[in-house]
Swiss-Prot record:
Residues 604-623 are annotated as: Pore-forming. Residues 1266-1277 have a biased composition (Low complexity). This is Glutamate receptor ionotropic, NMDA 2B. Detected in brain (at protein level). Detected throughout the brain, and in brain stem trigeminal nucleus. Detected in forebrain. The gene is Grin2b. Belongs to the glutamate-gated ion channel (TC 1.A.10.1) family. NR2B/GRIN2B subfamily. Phosphorylated on tyrosine residues. Phosphorylation at Ser-1303 by DAPK1 enhances synaptic NMDA receptor channel activity. The modification Phosphotyrosine is found at Y962, Y1039, Y1109, Y1133, Y1155, Y1472. Heterotetramer. Forms heterotetrameric channels composed of two GluN1/zeta subunits (GRIN1), and two identical GluN2/epsilon subunits (GRIN2A, GRIN2B, GRIN2C or GRIN2D) or GluN3 subunits (GRIN3A or GRIN3B) (in vitro). Can also form heterotetrameric channels that contain at least two GluN1 subunits and at least two different GluN2 subunits (or a combination of one GluN2 and one GluN3 subunits) (in vitro). In vivo, the subunit composition may depend on the expression levels of the different subunits. Found in a complex with GRIN1, GRIN3A and PPP2CB. Interacts with MAGI3. Disulfide bonds join C86-C321, C429-C456, C436-C457, C746-C801. It comes from Mus musculus (Mouse).
Length: 1482
């Protein structure tokens, strides 16, 4: 190889000398290692530029200094290149090569790859063929290229298509190496992209065949896509384009995109290449040859420097191209790692494993009509920047073809055109949007390189454009105008969208473009697709709330009707119904009504109804009558509707009312003379539009004034309106209406609800005299005809604030709206009036018939209830006797007389004289075989022969005092009622209830079976009548009184009593809280505390009654009271005492003298302050006397009592309230204090007797000062006691101490200390609750040892079952206890007064059976001979002793202290609250 003349020139050697001198100087100055690098320039290259590039001091900072060898050569054949490089290695000891050529031969790259692999020398191809794409490099090669890889170029080609929305394409390749990589890269990219790519064809052309063009033509004819990607060499591309041109694939409508391999040298362009060819090439404009040489030297030097820094050596120079040693291989591989990762001057110059740059500088070039390559885009940092926002469709000059691809300009203005950014993930536009280009104006860019970014457009006009393009069948490129707005002629030149169309840069202009005459002169407009004009927008002003806004929900008529119905109608109606109701407050139906009690006034009625309107937020008093309750309930429903309607409608009137400053139009004074207002009225518009033109042509002064207030855009104008910088904005009506509808907070409105001035329309601007106008007009008219235009208007032009006031604001509720509520109140009043009339008719006329009084048979209500019960339980109804003849019948079943009867019963229990004497009662208790009905405590006596006892005759005035009490109570009763009472008592000795006997008398009735069931009696208020005897009569004193206790409340002797009345307001509070405790606490106790029991009368009332009777002077026993039908009523009471056939006479004992003396003593005791307990001291004289013994001998009526019994009875060591024995009281003390021993209580009774911290047994406070008797007589009536001052004072002090029943608190505490039995109530659902430990356990099982009452002797032998807790009972068909002593539903005589006095009302007689009293406490065995000891204690003139009950006396049944303690007398242990009215307090 001969050196060229250029290489031997003096200039060349001068350069080498300079380099040598500089290198030696550097080595002398700094002993740094150097590396030899050969720079080979093939072809024509600028040596001076290269010299300037590597002579700079840019590499002095590196640890290795480059030693550059500049070589120029012209030969490009492989042999010359190989020889020259090998000579340099052997002569110059080079360690790297940088090669640049100006050819398009990709073979040079292949030669360099071969040399590098053989010599293990790094070679860099920086330009020309050496930098072209090369596939399948040698693995040991260190050949690197300044150029993009195949994959990188394929990615850039896809980005170009995506930029212009070219999604449909095909691929054409040859068998040139790397085609498979190219196709695979395209396929993998489109498969993993969000863009909707569509690859139609992939053609592989075999260029080695010599069969002509026919085969290639046939293959190219398959292509139908407008975009074609070509991969081949430059020579192959020349032939392919020639064939493609012959088949029409290079004309208008087809775009070819090729890599840099096809473009090659940009200075030579083959004639076969079509105009508009796009190529991806290495940047030749910004990255020239000198910069590449410099970077090549820097890459090798930097890599060697990094290697020296880490390993302290650099590769040794190569002396020959042959015989490579292993050490050289190791050093070269190590240097290769540093060459791949190089950063120089902050630029990343790294290479990939394939030897291509990681970040190449690429450009997109276009072959223009001048047949020159034009740079139209740049790829930098994986971002594409294109010059043309619409791709120029370039075609040959000779081709005349109709253009169906249009360039369209638009303007951003919502809602007609809305511009958005592309999707950040896919980089494309989403659905229902159209790609549009937006130009970026920058001062740093030249006019030749404008920047554009891709945007997405949508809106009303865009949807119209899409529909028109489908109908007319054309494609388009959309871009946004930048030089102006809609278009205005300035100095004879149009700008904006009109200017783009006039300059023919766009075929059409679509947007909010108003049609006017000036624009129509230069462009053609389509028919208007929307009507518009000029409108004015203002800001709403904040109003104030009216003071009467709270009244606005209802009209004045509704408010008037509200108060009329409340004050006049509803309140008055409730008051009248309540006042005249049978159970109202002001109806004095009972004498016991408290004076000054509550009354339901008209004011309370108004207050009640007014409180209901506001949800009972104030304390009110509720009515009691049924009619008034109905009226109040309906009013409550009315109040709910009224208040809910008011509240719901109030929100619409309480919000701020907004007012709009009205402007009549453009001729308004505020527009024509704005300075006349203070402050001046400010208004403006957007310049360069049809609105400004219209104002300028019609209102010159207005146009001159508004110039300083004009806005740059609609958004700026809206902001100025909200901030107060602008008072009115004049613009297109369509745009303003949309903005007003979409305004946040709806603060902006158009005057006159969108009033339009200078009406016109929006149209599409088309180039003048274009053939597209007619087709576009027809397409728009078709949209109107199909209704699609209305759909688009509803979609885009309707805002949320449109008609807002009509939707939110509610109208006033007039009388028609509220008429239904007032109709409801009227109907309620009518119904209440009918109910009121029916209530009175039933109460005064039909009530007795329903209760069976009229027919004498069971009432309808009773029959229905008993029939249902019988069907369920299989109990037959036996109507053998009239229900009114039953002993359980009542004298009057009305609630109105209950309180009167209760008071009468108490008065009768406290009567003086004959009625208070126990003598007559004792006459009946004979020693013969008579049976006293102790179970029901009635005067029902029979002999063993089932014959009734014949009462002896009585005196005429026997019941005068008693009848006077009855006359005072029942004086107004009709005659038929009296007959009912008399018939009732005639059958009293043989009582029968429906289906069974209700007395022990039935057990000895020869006509009845020995044992029958006892179904529940009628639910009435039975009234059993007992008659007191005369003072001198031989008849017994009738103990029984008017009992108001029904069958359901009579119970076992040992058990706690249930309630005493059937009154619905009575609520039993059971003392036993065992069992289902949770249920009782939540239901029974809770309900009992809410309701008001009948027996809970005010203690003050009882105290007044008792004190009144104490103050009454004693009446003469002969005092007569005359009343209607007195003789018949006397016969009614005397009938029971007349002697009957076959009955033994009773022995009469005259105790007149005893009671006479007692009467005198009582008078003296009452004067001296003797209490009710001290008068019992007359019965005992000294310590040697027995209790109840006259002269040391038992009284005649106590002949059968044994001494043991008398000791137990009279010992005085038992509590007066319970059978507990008092161990701390001896017989001696008891004998000395016999007058007080009846009042002694045990500690438990003392504790339970406290009521609100008031001691019940105040008489025990003076027990430490006993008063012994001073005289002893054989007759009890002559006993005298000294009245010491202390004792008299104590008696006087204790005289007014009124005893109280146990309160709820003490009762519960008592139950906690001493457990009581289970409650007396039971129901089917509580069956399981009472299976154990309950008197009702016998209802579900039959013990084997139960004996029946089939024989007569069972009366005296079966009595031990009565008090034996472990005894069982025979199972019967009834749900109630079999024995009358166990039945809690049988009424008793005298229980009413015992309820009031707290005493026990049972008379006991000691049985004649020997040892019976000593062996067991047989209750029935005690019937015959038990004396009424308390009768002697209570012999008080003028009234009964209120402690006449035997519960205060000694009980022969010695109790077990472990058993439950009995309560005082017949006190049932319940809590009775005050009863202020009789009817149900529901």
């Amino acid at each position: 190889m001969k050196p060229s003349a250029e290489c031997c020139s003096p200039k060349f050697w001068l350069v080498l000398a300079v380099l040598a001198v500089s290198g030696s100087k550097a080595r002398s100055q700094k002993s740094a290692p150097s590396i030899g690098i050969a720079v080979i320039l093939v072809g024509t290259s600028d040596e001076v530029a290269i010299k300037d590039a590597h002579e700079k001091d840019d590499f002095h900072h590196l640890s290795v200094v480059p030693r550059v060898e500049l070589v120029a050569m012209n030969e490009t054949d492989p042999k010359s290149i190989i020889t020259r490089i090998c000579d340099l290695m052997s002569d110059r000891k080079i360690q790297g090569v940088v090669l640049a050529d100006d050819t398009d031969q990709e073979a040079i790259a292949q030669i360099l790859d071969f040399i590098s692999a053989q010599t293990l020398t790094p070679i860099l191809g920086i330009h020309g063929g050496s930098s072209m794409i090369m596939a399948d490099k040698d693995e040991s090669s260190m050949f690197f290229q300044f150029g993009p890889s195949i994959e990188q170029q394929a990615s850039v080609m896809l980005n170009i298509m995506e930029e212009y929305d070219w999604y449909i394409f095909s691929i054409v390749t040859t068998y040139f190496p790397g085609y498979q990589d190219f196709v695979n890269k395209i396929r993998s990219t489109i498969e993993n992209s969000f863009v909707g790519w569509e690859l139609e064809e992939v053609l592989l052309l075999d260029m080695s065949l010599d069969d002509g063009d026919s085969k290639i033509q046939n293959q190219l004819k398959k292509l139908q896509s407008p975009i074609i990607l070509l991969y081949c060499t430059k020579e192959e591309a020349t032939y392919i384009f020639e064939v493609a041109n012959s088949v029409g694939l290079t004309g208008y409508g087809y775009t070819w995109i090729v890599p840099s391999l096809v473009a090659g040298d940009t200075d030579t362009v083959p004639s076969e290449f079509p105009t508009g060819l796009i190529s991806v090439s290495y940047d030749e404009w910004d990255y020239g040859l000198p910069a590449r040489v410099r970077d090549g030297i820097a890459i090798i030097t930097t890599a060697a420097s990094d290697m020296l820094s880490e390993h302290s050596f650099i590769p040794e120079p190569k002396s020959s191209c042959y015989n490579t040693h292993e050490k050289r291989i190791y050093q070269s591989n190590m240097l290769n790692r540093y060459l791949i990762n190089v950063t120089f001057e902050g630029r990343n110059l790294s290479f990939s494993e394939d030897g291509y740059q990681m970040h190449p500088k690429l450009v997109i070039i276009l072959l223009n009509k001048e047949r020159k390559w034009e740079r139209v885009g740049k790829w930098k940092d994986k971002s594409l920047q294109m010059k043309y926002y619409v791709w120029p469709r370039m075609c040959p000059e000779t081709e005349e073809q109709e253009d169906d691809h249009l360039s369209i300009v638009t303007l951003e203005e919502a809602p007609f055109v809305i511009v958005e950014s592309v999707d950040p993930l896919s980089g494309t536009c989403m659905r229902n949007t159209v790609p549009c280009q937006k130009r970026i104006i920058s001062e740093n860019k030249t006019d030749e390189e404008p920047g554009y970014i891709k945007k997405c457009c949508k809106g009303f006009c865009i949807d119209i454009l899409k529909k028109i393009s489908k109908s007319v069948k054309f494609t388009y490129d959309l871009y946004l105008v930048t030089n102006g707005k809609h278009g205005k002629k300035i100095n004879g030149t149009w700008n904006g969208m009109i200017g783009e169309v006039v300059m023919k840069r766009a075929y059409m202009a679509v947007g909010s473009l108003t049609i006017n005459e000036e624009r129509s002169e230069v462009v053609d407009f389509s028919v208007p697709f929307i009507e518009t004009g000029i409108s004015v927008m203002v800001s709403r002003s904040n109003g104030t709330v009216s003071p009467s806004a709270f009244l606005e929900p209802f009209s004045a008529d509704v408010w008037v009707m509200m108060f009329v119905m409340l004050l006049i109608v509803s309140a008055v109606a409730v008051f009248v119904f309540e006042y005249f109701s049978p159970v109202g407050y002001n109806r004095c139906l009972a004498d016991g009504r408290e004076p000054g009690g509550p009354s339901f006034t008209i004011g309370k009625a108004i207050w009640l109804l007014w409180g209901l309107v506001f949800n009972n937020s104030v304390p009110v008093q509720n009515p009691k009558g049924t009619t008034s309750k109905i009226m109040v309930s309906v009013w409550a429903f009315f109040a709910v509707i009224f208040l809910a309607s008011y509240t719901a409608n109030l929100a619409a009137f309480m919000i701020q009312e907004e007012y709009v400053d009205q402007v009549s139009g453009l001729s308004d004074k505020k527009f024509q003379r704005p300075n006349d207002f203070s402050p001046p009225f400010r208004f403006g518009t957007v310049p360069n539009g049809s609105t400004e033109r219209n104002i300028r042509n019609n209102y010159a002064e207005m146009h001159a004034y508004m110039g300083k207030f004009n806005q740059r855009g609609v958004d700026d104008a809206l902001l100025s309106l909200k901030t107060g910088k602008l008072d009115a904005f004049i613009y297109d009506a369509a745009v303003l209406n949309y903005m007003a509808g979409r305004d946040e907070g709806c603060k902006l409105v158009t005057i006159g609800s969108g009033k339009v001035f200078a009406s016109t329309g929006y149209g599409i601007a088309i180039q003048k005299d274009s053939g597209w106008k007619r087709q576009v007009d027809l397409a728009i008219l078709q949209l109107f005809g199909d209704g699609e235009m209305e759909e688009l208007e509803a979609l885009w032009l309707t805002g949320i604030c449109h008609n807002e006031k009509n939707e939110v604001m509610s109208s006033q509720l007039d009388i028609d709206n509220m008429a239904g509520v007032f109709y409801m109140l009227g109907a309620a009043m009518a119904l209440s009036l009918i109910t009121f009339i029916c209530e009175h008719l039933f109460y005064w006329q039909f009530r007795h018939c329903f209760m069976g009084v009229c027919s004498g048979k069971p009432g309808m209500v009773f029959s229905i209830s008993r029939g249902i019960y019988s069907c369920i339980h299989g109990v037959a109804i036996e109507e053998r006797q009239s229900v009114m003849n039953s002993p359980t019948a009542t004298m009057n079943n009305t609630h109105s007389n209950i309180l009167r009867l209760l008071r009468t019963a108490k008065n009768m229990a406290n009567l003086s004289g004959v009625n208070g004497s126990p003598q007559s009662a004792l006459d009946f208790i004979r020693r013969e075989s008579s049976v006293y009905d102790i179970s029901e405590h009635r005067r029902s006596f029979t002999h063993s022969d089932c014959k009734s006892y014949n009462n002896p005759p009585c005196e005429e005035n026997l019941f005068s005092d008693y009848i006077s009490e009855v006359e005072r109570t029942f004086g107004n009763l009709q005659l038929k009622d009296s007959n009912v009472y008399q018939d009732h008592y005639h059958h009293h000795h043989r009582p029968h209830s429906i289906g069974s006997t209700s007395s022990i008398d039935g057990l000895y009735d020869c006509d009845n079976p020995p044992f029958t069931t006892q179904p529940r009696s009628i639910s009435k208020k039975p009234l059993d009548i007992g008659l007191p005897s005369s003072k001198h009569s031989q008849l017994s004193d009738l103990y029984g009184k008017f009992s108001f206790k029904s069958d359901r409340y009579s119970g076992h002797d040992d058990l706690i009593r249930s309630d005493v009345s059937d009154i619905s307001t009575h609520t039993v509070t059971y003392g036993n809280i065992e069992g289902n405790a949770a249920k009782r606490r939540k239901q029974q106790y809770k309900d009992s505390l809410k309701k008001r029991p009948a027996s809970a009368k005010s203690r003050r009332e009882f105290d007044e009654i008792e004190l009144a009777y104490r103050r009454r002077p004693p009446r003469s026993p002969d005092h007569k009271r005359y009343f209607r039908d007195k003789e018949g009523l006397r016969d009614f009471y005397l009938d029971q005492f007349r002697t009957k056939e076959n009955s033994p006479h009773w022995e009469h004992v005259d105790l007149t003298d005893i009671y006479k003396e007692r009467s005198d003593d009582f008078k003296r005791d009452s004067v001296s302050g003797g209490g009710p307990c001290t008068n019992r001291s007359h019965l005992k004289h000294g310590t040697g006397d027995k209790h109840g013994v006259v002269g040391g001998v038992p009284a005649p009526w106590e002949k059968n009592l044994t001494n043991v019994d008398w000791e137990d009875r009279s010992g005085g060591n038992f509590c007066r309230s319970c059978p507990s024995k008092l161990h701390n009281y001896s017989s001696t003390v008891a004998g000395q204090n016999s007058g007080r021993q009846a009042c002694i209580r045990c500690e438990a009774c003392k504790k339970a007797g406290n009521l609100y911290d008031i001691s019940e047994d105040n008489s025990l406070q003076e027990l430490d000062q006993p008063a012994a008797p001073v005289a002893v007589s054989s007759n009890a009536s002559t006993t005298k006691y000294p009245q010491s001052p202390t004792n008299s004072k104590a008696q006087k002090k204790n005289r007014n101490k009124l005893r109280r029943q146990h309160s709820y608190d003490t009762f519960v505490d008592l139950q906690k200390e001493e457990a009581a039995l289970a409650p007396r109530s039971v129901s089917l659902k509580d069956k399981g609750r009472f299976m154990d430990g309950s008197p009702y356990a016998h209802m579900f099982e039959m013990p084997a040892g139960e004996s029946s009452f089939a024989n007569k002797s069972s009366v005296t032998t079966a009595g031990h079952h009565h008090n034996n807790p472990g005894s069982g009972y025979m199972l019967s068909k009834s749900l109630y206890p079999d024995r009358v002593t166990q039945n809690p539903f049988i009424p008793t005589f005298g229980d009413d007064q015992c309820l009031l006095h707290g005493s026990k009302s049972y008379f006991f007689r000691q049985p004649t059976v020997a040892g019976a009293s000593k062996t067991r406490p047989d209750f029935r065995a005690l019937v015959t001979n038990k004396p009424v000891v308390s009768a002697l204690h209570g012999a008080v003139p003028g009234r009964f002793q209120k402690d006449i009950c035997i519960g205060n006396q000694s009980n022969p049944c010695v109790p077990n202290n472990k058993n439950p303690r009995a309560f005082n007398g017949s006190s049932n242990g319940h809590v009775y609250e005050k009863l202020s009215s009789i009817e149900s307090d529901v």
